[in-house]
């Protein structure tokens, strides 16, 4: 792998350590990427352990060949939202000792201009995690209604100027279609008046389009529910998120399943019954990267790690 597209796994020790790995355990790396977390898991597993890695990026599947000679490892080409389906096919429901998810876009995807994720590198406006199928960002921008674009920019990018940007895109695309990242980034920079300090004006819109094109938040919801289904008692969830939308979903999921089902006041139900509805317990507080890690890897700055354990009821 070229140095240009090298990937530094964020919160590596903390995330893998949070899985509390057993020698003969069965683990899932739901976001293989370039294998940083998988490598650490394999180093801690015994000879009877097992690691199932998942990724929908064809380049990640290619990178997984580095572990082809390790009988403990297997790679699945698909989205982590379907992890419960993959585990069911393998007959391992209720036997998984840990699930790791490193959410969002990876450094190699951002750094490769041909993938179209970055407003800093000119390339085709693609943004698909799996670039072998599905609609590209350029195709969506060419057909989307103004209202739909504004909703996506506001909901997934928390963009204050969502409607104005959507209108300008619609007006400009009739003359020249948006086919490259630079086309879109330049337009947003040109029409944005109140620019945020130390943040490119296109940051939020690019994030929003990427999340929409890849159904990222739906994938997270599905993966979390799936993990709850497949985890063994005392199995661990170790999840890194990179922006507030992701972290909010993870935080609320852990909180909801740590508190148990809410019941109307006065309903005749015992404390034991309420406890049995609890499926998770949070392990410690949210973990942030150290100043030293941020200095080594600026992309770690916004990362948050949350760890939870499946309860045995």
UniProtKB/Swiss-Prot annotation:
Record InterPro entries: RsmH, SAM-dep_MeTrfase_MraW_recog, SAM-dependent_MTases_sf
GO aspect biological process, one term: rRNA base methylation
Subcellular location: Cytoplasm
GO cellular component, one term: cytoplasm
Record: residues binding S-adenosyl-L-methionine: 35-37, 55, 80, 102, 109
This protein's UniProt keywords: Cytoplasm, Methyltransferase, rRNA processing, S-adenosyl-L-methionine, Transferase
EC annotation from Swiss-Prot or TrEMBL: 2.1.1.199
Keyword Methyltransferase: yes
Protein's UniProt keywords contain Secreted: no
Protein name, UniProt field: Ribosomal RNA small subunit methyltransferase H
Organism: Shewanella sp. (strain MR-7)
Lineage of the organism: Bacteria, Pseudomonadati, Pseudomonadota, Gammaproteobacteria, Alteromonadales
Gene name per UniProt: rsmH
């Amino acid at each position: 792998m070229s140095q240009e597209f090298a990937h530094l796994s964020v919160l590596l020790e903390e995330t893998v350590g949070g899985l509390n790995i057993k020698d003969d355990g069965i683990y899932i790396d739901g976001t293989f990427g370039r294998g940083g977390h998988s490598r650490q898991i394999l180093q801690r597993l015994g000879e009877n352990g097992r690691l199932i890695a998942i990724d929908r990026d064809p380049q990640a599947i290619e990178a997984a060949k580095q572990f082809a000679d390790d009988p403990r490892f297997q790679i699945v080409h698909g989205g982590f939202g379907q992890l419960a389906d993959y585990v069911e096919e393998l007959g391992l429901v209720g036997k998984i000792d840990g699930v790791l998810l490193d959410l969002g876009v990876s450094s190699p995807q951002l750094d490769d201009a041909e993938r179209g994720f970055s407003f800093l590198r000119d390339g085709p406006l693609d943004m698909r995690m799996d670039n072998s199928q599905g609609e590209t960002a350029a195709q969506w921008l060419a057909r989307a209604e103004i209202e739909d674009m504004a909703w996506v920019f506001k909901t997934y990018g928390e963009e204050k100027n969502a409607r104005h940007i959507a209108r300008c895109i619609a007006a400009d695309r009739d003359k020249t279609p948006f086919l490259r990242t630079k086309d879109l980034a330049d337009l947003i920079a040109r029409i944005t008046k109140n620019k945020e300090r130390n943040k490119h004006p296109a940051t939020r819109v690019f994030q929003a389009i990427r999340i929409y094109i890849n159904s990222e938040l739906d994938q997270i919801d599905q993966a979390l529910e799936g993990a709850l289904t497949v985890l063994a008692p005392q199995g661990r969830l170790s999840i890194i998120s990179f922006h507030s939308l992701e972290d909010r979903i993870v935080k609320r999921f852990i909180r909801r399943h740590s508190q148990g089902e809410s019941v109307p006041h006065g309903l005749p139900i015992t404390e034991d019954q309420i406890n049995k509805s609890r499926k998770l317990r949070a392990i410690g507080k949210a973990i942030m990267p150290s100043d030293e890690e941020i200095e080594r890897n600026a992309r770690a700055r916004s990362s948050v790690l949350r760890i939870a354990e499946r309860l045995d009821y």
